[in-house]
Amino acid sequence: MSEMTPREIVSELDSYIIGQHKAKRAVSIALRNRWRRMQLDEALRHEVTPKNILMIGPTGVGKTEIARRLAKLANAPFIKVEATKFTEVGYVGKEVDSIIRDLTDSAIKMVRHQSIEKNRFRAEEMAEDRILDVLIPPAKNNWGQAEGTQEPSATRQAFRKKLREGQLDDKEIEIDLAASPVGVEIMAPPGMEEMTNQLQSMFQNLAGQKQKAHKVKIKDAFKLLIEEEAAKLVNPEELKQQAIEAVEQHGIVFIDEIDKICKRGESSGPDVSREGVQRDLLPLVEGCTVSTKHGMVKTDHILFIASGAFQVASPSDLIPELQGRLPIRVELQALTTEDFERILTEPSASLTEQYKALMATEGVDISFTADGIRRIAEAAWQVNESTENIGARRLHTVMERLIEDVSYDASEMNGQSVIIDADYVRSHLDELVADEDLSRFIL
């Protein structure tokens, strides 16, 4: 679990997301409260429930990006799902309980990776010993059993030194590795993925663990053996318990496009993918127990963050019970020309930096002037205003159109420089921006 302070979390998010300070503050406080809760006495800790968040804002302003970056910062089980993928229980489609199952699967992977990293040093020593056993085989007695290494310890240590210095990296050896389980492809109707996974696991377990000889270079063998030895040091039952505890105490679920499951007007017939899904989400958000293949998981202390554009519907169109379980509301603002300028230059790996790096691979030096960046931002904002406002995603379309000629000819422009200033931008974009029909279909 992350121990970062709210200020540190916001600072980290600032490196990738421009503006939206209120949303950053809300998620940073929610993330810090996870840590604060774990410092309390057990009796009080059980009573402190997470304050779920609803992020409201037009498309392309950073809602999903906040979720992506938060996943890396959280150091906790995290899953992002689309609300539109689910249907009401009893109909064809994914049930909302699969959110918790997928979250538990991701926690298993996370905890396994942490356990392997924790045991890596020991695994490296064991991998070295296995390679040395191949290079210096132990002598065998009359019954074909190993009597132990007969060579003097100095010889083994000399080979170990060479191995660690990389002198033997390119030497080929034959080692026995666990064979990959035979894949059994099972087709199942939508919503029955859990049954498919269980059947596949059953067939793989029936096949058993077999060893297979591989002829590889020592440097590749070392990596493979480390992974195999580290996996042996992991206790599967302990792994499951740690993963389930991590989900229950620190798990975060991000539900995107929640506005798409709002009921719109009066309709006859069942609302299997709208209001029905909201009703199914209620127990998860409030707290219930979900059965997974790894064990029972309680959702009482899982943090839920929902987001939606709410351009057609409004938050009040959610059923009242679900509204009450999303107490923190954060409104994200539409992006301005100034925001677009900052997006083009300030974030780590900004769009301009990406295009510079891509063209540099062909030996072409691209530079963007301040007035050129300003004009790109104005063009993107203008197209958003005159057609459909898709926020910062418009910059990708505009930049691709702007760099198209250079990108096409780059392989024949080795050693040349291209300066993208306001005049360059006008000559490539102004005609498209001015013509609403063209900008609607091209930009």
From Swiss-Prot:
Compartmental location: Cytoplasm
Which of UniProt's keywords are assigned here?
A: ATP-binding, Chaperone, Cytoplasm, Nucleotide-binding
What the entry lists under CDD domains is as follows:
RecA-like_HslU
Per the record, the major location class is cytoplasm
Query: Where is ATP annotated to bind?
Result: I18, G60, V61, G62, K63, T64, E65, D256, E321, R393
Subunit annotation? A double ring-shaped homohexamer of HslV is capped on each side by a ring-shaped HslU homohexamer. The assembly of the HslU/HslV complex is dependent on binding of ATP.
What protein family is recorded? Belongs to the ClpX chaperone family. HslU subfamily.
PANTHER family from the UniProt entry: ATP-DEPENDENT CLP PROTEASE ATP-BINDING SUBUNIT CLPX-LIKE, MITOCHONDRIAL-RELATED (PTHR48102), ATP-DEPENDENT PROTEASE ATPASE SUBUNIT HSLU (PTHR48102:SF3)
Protein known as: ATP-dependent protease ATPase subunit HslU
The organism of origin for this protein = Pectobacterium atrosepticum (strain SCRI 1043 / ATCC BAA-672) (Erwinia carotovora subsp. atroseptica)
